[in-house]
């Protein structure tokens, strides 16, 4: 990265622009010149939505050290303001689902995501925009959840959930069950752009995943039950509840 452009105090340098994924935020491949590692740099502008909230949320995310979360390494609040994160790494969940996953693998992936979000919740952070694009599987087999501390603030989702302190936990919990259903069946329980929708029962709930997932066996009946309870309004209220509902899994 000999042509990288230093920013701020000079510790970080910008090497190349990445495709935009968030409004009014410019993503770059960057370099931490002190630790000699590749990073992702999110450059904010005066037009970035909810700019102050984004910087505050990202600053709290620095304190989350769970390896399953895309780490936020540093936050610069001056001009230019920017956020330094761990690069996204590994294969996206959508690719893995397309190739087919065993029920045990889906249980493990969603369980690991749930535990990671539980760690974030203890810091007052929530994803609120969890999707198949938010989850990756690294080459070493660990999951990586991207966007914590950044996406929700930029999209204004933190503000929408602020009126009810428990609403953010419920949103992430339901999203985890949606990912579980998608991972098992290759169908989305509802409507989502680019994904086929799951068939529904007479009351509008998605059919049990076992009706569509050939990899499920009788021991996976708890997954059917978790889905049914969620669409009956009796589902888990937080990521930690989802993790407990999934029981044990092999994270290797």
Predicted regions and their residues:
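Activation segment signature within eukaryotic-like protein kinase domains
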Residues: 109-110
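C-terminal lobe helix-coil module of Hanks-type protein kinase domains
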Residues: 158-251
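Short pocket-lining segment of the protein kinase catalytic domain that shapes the ATP-binding cleft
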Residues: 83-91
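AlphaC helix of the eukaryotic protein kinase fold
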Residues: 45-63
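Conserved N-lobe loop of protein kinases adjacent to the ATP-binding glycine-rich P-loop
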Residues: 30-38
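Short beta-strand micro-motifs within the conserved protein kinase catalytic domain, predominantly
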Residues: 71-81
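AlphaC helix of the protein kinase catalytic domain
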Residues: 93-102
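Protein kinase catalytic-loop region centered on the HRD/HxD motif
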Residues: 114-125
């Amino acid at each position: 990265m000999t042509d990288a452009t230093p920013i701020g105090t000079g510790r970080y340098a910008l090497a190349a622009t990445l495709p935009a994924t968030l409004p009014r935020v410019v993503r770059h491949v960057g370099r931490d010149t002190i630790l000699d590692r590749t990073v992702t740099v999110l450059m904010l502008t005066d037009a970035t939505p909810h700019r102050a909230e984004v910087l505050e949320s990202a600053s709290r995310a620095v304190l989350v050290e769970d390896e399953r979360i895309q780490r936020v390494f540093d936050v610069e609040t001056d001009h230019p303001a920017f956020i330094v994160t761990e690069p996204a790494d590994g294969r996206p969940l959508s690719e893995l689902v397309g190739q087919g996953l065993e029920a045990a693998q889906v249980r493990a992936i969603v369980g690991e995501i749930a535990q990671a979000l539980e760690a974030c919740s203890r810091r007052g952070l929530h994803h609120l925009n969890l999707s198949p694009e938010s989850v990756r599987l690294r080459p070493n087999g660990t999951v990586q959840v991207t966007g914590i501390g950044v996406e929700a603030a930029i999209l204004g989702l933190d503000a929408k959930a602020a009126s009810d302190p428990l609403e953010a936990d419920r949103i992430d919990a339901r999203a985890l069950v949606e990912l579980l259903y998608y991972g098992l069946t290759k169908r989305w329980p509802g409507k989502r752009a680019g994904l086929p929708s799951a068939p529904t029962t007479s009351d509008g709930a998605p059919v049990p995943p076992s009706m569509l997932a050939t990899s499920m066996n009788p021991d996976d009946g708890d997954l059917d039950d978790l889905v049914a309870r969620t669409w009956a309004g009796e589902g888990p209220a937080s990521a930690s509840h989802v993790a407990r509902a999934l029981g044990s899994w092999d994270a290797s």
